[in-house]
Amino acid sequence: MAGGGGYGGASGKVDYVFKVVLIGDSAVGKSQLLARFARDEFSMDSKATIGVEFQTRTLSIEQKSIKAQIWDTAGQERYRAVTSAYYRGAVGAMLVYDMTKRETFEHIPRWLEELRAHADKNIVIILIGNKSDLEDQRAVPTEDAKEFAEKEGLFFLETSALNATNVENSFNTLMTQIYNTVNKKNLASEGDSNNPGSLAGKKILIPGSGQEIPAKTSTCCTSS
């Protein structure tokens, strides 16, 4: 399980650094989710992100120190200018839509297609329906998102960056699944140490197929 970690760049020994990318339409709350997770902050006057931005936070998972390096699209999505370099090296992704704006959910398949075209094929992905605090303005039923997540093999949660609902849970879920996948790949490599082409002894940050929790059993945890 993931434990609490330090906000910002914690010092000390780090066992793994995992790059995670946030993708989705503008104004769905990606930067707010990042600020809430990395610094436990929320600004009502948040402006669109300009320029490349990433923040870090160190977590403890299974007695290992894991540094989450979370990248924001920096507003490039408005110009469809997100490049392959943004996805390079990512082992996890948060696919974010605004549950009060149906079109942001309808654009998710396009974002997923782009992600899968540029990222490692085994990247761990969680679908996030943000702004769950605006339930009276909901335009995307939970069941629609659940069905899509199950079909595509994604994890799924609804969050609110405003009141912090499920923000910690969503990042912890993603980081734990990445760690489990990497750990299984390392064990498999060590078991294959007699193979001259083995990668035993190296830390592998790209997820393998592993035995991940099936999406159908991992999409039940939405905000209350």
UniProtKB/Swiss-Prot annotation:
GTP binds at residues 24-31, 72-76, 130-133, 160-161. Expressed in roots, stems, leaves and flowers. Expressed in tips of growing root hair cells. A lipid is attached at C220, C221 (S-geranylgeranyl cysteine). Keywords: Acetylation, Endosome, Golgi apparatus, GTP-binding, Lipoprotein, Membrane, Nucleotide-binding, Prenylation, Protein transport, Transport. One of its GO terms (cellular component) is plasma membrane. The modification N-acetylalanine is found at A2. GO terms for molecular function: GTP binding; GTPase activity; kinase binding. It is a lipid-anchor. It is found in: Early endosome membrane; Golgi apparatus, trans-Golgi network membrane. It comes from the Eukaryota. A motif (Effector region) lies at residues 46-54. CDD domains: Rab11_like. Interacts with TCTP1. Regulator of membrane trafficking. May be required for secretion of cell wall components in cells. Belongs to the small GTPase superfamily. Rab family. NCBIfam families: small_GTP. This is Ras-related protein RABA4b. It comes from Arabidopsis thaliana.
